[in-house]
Amino acid sequence: MVMWVFGYGSLVWNPGFHYDEKVLGFIKGYKRVFDLACIDHRGTPEHPARTCTLEKAEEAICWGTAFCVRGGPEKERLAMEYLERRECEYDLKTSVDFYKEDDPLKPAVTGVIVFTSTPDKVSNKYYLGPAPLEDMARQIATANGPCGNNRDYLFLLEKAMHDIGHEEDYVIELANEVRKVLAESSTKKVTPVKESRASRVANKSKNNVPTAHQILPHHPEAVATTI
């Protein structure tokens, strides 16, 4: 028996399970969106991260990597148990056709499993839904979890898509907006001005000079002179 799984998020650069074959390609009718909450890897329940899920889009394609697991039911079971724990925020497993670049019309593999999510906040508590780019960028720039921060997840995906030769405008645009948020945040941090030794000595000397009010009460003749 053979099991195929399509990865379009962190699985692309970090599958984390034993597989026998890896193939670059794409699926049709879906686009990648950052509309799913992650509360146990790159975020927390109080401050969820935004991670990838798929949204149906008739003319869209989504590039990624298909992983093949061969060796019988036990090997497939172990791989799937790992994936279900890891992809626990995804409430659906969808069967799709997988295409390779050299033949974009004929499926290279059918029945490929892909983890997706129901786009409904009522039936799927992890579904965040779309948001303005700036709002998503602020959330991604600040979310952190046990496995790292949310921005690294996005930047690693951006790099992975570049490495496989299929950069995605949406991912690049979101990553650049996160960089903008991080840059703005760093400029708001004011670094205290360090006083030079010469300035400290001068200020100390200035502070040690007694004022007229400190001198005059002890010298009545000085009072008469000033009057």
Curated annotation (Swiss-Prot):
GO CC list: cytoplasm
UniProt xrefs under InterPro entries: ChaC, GGCT-like
Note on cofactor: Binds 2 Mn(2+) ions per subunit.
First and last residue of the signal peptide: none
Keywords: Cytoplasm, Lyase
Family the UniProt entry places it in: Belongs to the gamma-glutamylcyclotransferase family.
Name by which UniProt lists this protein: Gamma-glutamylcyclotransferase 2-2
Protein source organism: Arabidopsis thaliana (Mouse-ear cress)
Name of encoding gene: GGCT2;2
